[in-house]
Regions:
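Active-site-proximal beta-strand elements of phosphoester/diester hydrolases
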Residues: 2-17, 46-48, 105-110, 145-146
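Feature marks short, surface-exposed loop/turn motifs that line or immediately flank catalytic pockets
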Residues: 17, 53-55, 115
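His/acidic metal-ligating clusters that form di-metal
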Residues: 21-105, 141
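Binuclear metal-dependent phosphoesterase catalytic core
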Residues: 78, 96-149
Length: 149
């Protein structure tokens, strides 16, 4: 893809854990990401990851989706060193959510399908099915959420 006259790159970060469904960003994963980002510092980069790397609330302690909050802090330190990151695309929480890390948007995609449940289901409590369409336009990252009617 193109970003102005520069090529862009995407990088996927494995946030899975063998211990729980919470995210894991250990030293090895963070060092690998940092190394990849150092290789192409002038190349606009989109980071794909399952667990959103941000606090999801204003509560104390903060609600997050990682085994411990320090993992998010360590990730943020790496992000601070790499201004070429233009967006973070995530999932996991099954609802649309947007935030920022520095100037880069963090976009959480809502579920592409309703959950398959056995027994009676209250569909009013389920998130809307949706998808996001991402594009570059006029040297900016654009995001549009399109919902199923």
């Amino acid at each position: 893809s193109k970003f102005g006259s520069l090529s862009s790159q995407s990088s996927s970060v494995d946030t899975s854990s063998q211990n729980s469904n919470l995210g894991l960003l250990n030293f090895s994963k963070l060092a690998h990401l940092d190394g990849l980002l150092r290789q192409k510092q002038s190349c606009p980069t989109i980071i794909f990851m399952h667990h959103p790397p941000i606090s999801l609330s204003n509560s104390e302690p903060p609600e997050h989706e990682y085994e411990n909050f320090r993992m998010i802090e360590n990730f943020a330190e790496i992000v601070d060193r790499h201004p070429q990151i233009i967006a973070f695309l995530c999932g996991h929480i099954h609802r649309a959510f947007s935030s920022h890390i520095n100037a880069s948007p963090v976009m959480v995609t809502p579920p592409p399908a309703k959950r398959l449940c056995r027994g009676a289901v209250d569909h009013a409590k389920m998130p809307e099915v949706a998808f996001r369409l991402h594009s570059f336009k006029e040297n900016a990252f654009k995001d549009t959420t399109v919902r199923d009617c």
